[in-house]
Amino acid sequence: MFGNKILDFKDELLKDLNTLLSFESVDGEKNDECDNALNFILKRAEDFGLTGERTTDKSGHITFGDSGKLCGVLTHLDVVPAGNSWSVPPYALTEKDGRLYGRGIADDKGAALVTLYCLKAIKDSGVKGVNTLRAIYGTGEETGMEDMENYFKKNPLPDMAFTPDSDYGICFAEKGILQLEVSTLLNNATTLSQFHAGRAVNAVPDRAYVMLDSSDYDEQTLMRLADASDGDFEFNYTID
């Protein structure tokens, strides 16, 4: 089968994946690393004899063919912060029990790199298609997709497109994400002095904590709230 051609590049692909994972490409925090990840993909495309182009500060594409309809494959190279609870190095490739581990392997660096290698496999096989394939790469998907908004101000919309940014099965929609700012009035006896729950709104934090300064401390009420909720809770308090 033609699809098996990708297996010829397995070792080379895994080596490149390790390099791609090494970039701590958190948009808004590590913009230079986002640049490095995008430049790496475009450089590898050049190595393979493909046509790559940096289109905006946060996007680029690799094109195969120049006729017919334009088919886009959209992937992203940015990741959410890794957090502190990894059992393996998050920014390196680890193979364990038949699985690959590293921040971004599933979302979406693995698919981004496989897309590049699929174009390489097609090119090396001498396939002459009647349509144009374009792999589109962004580095701001996790922070609102401003990368694609700006990309399509300068580049045409594909006639057809998909993104390999999901588990197996074809999806045409995704659940939404609602970002809220909540404010409330506290009584004079209680002050919310600290509240921390990770570094990204679209990732489950490994740890969250709140600090209250209160002269009306009710341990039993807090215990009942904890028992009614999911997760593990730990209470530390001092009494003046």
Where are these regions (language model features)?
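Acidic/His- and Gly-rich active-site-bordering loop/insert found
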Residues: 2-103, 124-129
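Residues at alpha-helix caps and immediate loop-helix transition turns in enzyme cores, especially N-
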Residues: 33, 85, 111, 147-148
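Short glycine-/small-residue-rich flexible loop motifs, especially phosphate/cofactor-binding loops
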Residues: 42, 119, 223
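General beta-strand structural signal in soluble alpha/beta enzymes
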Residues: 53-56, 102, 135-137, 162-164
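A general structural motif
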Residues: 68, 130-132, 157-159
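Alpha-helical metal-binding/catalytic segments enriched in His/Glu/Asp
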Residues: 73, 94-142, 180-186, 206-217, ...
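Midchain, well-structured core segments that form catalytic/ion-binding scaffolds
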Residues: 142, 146-240
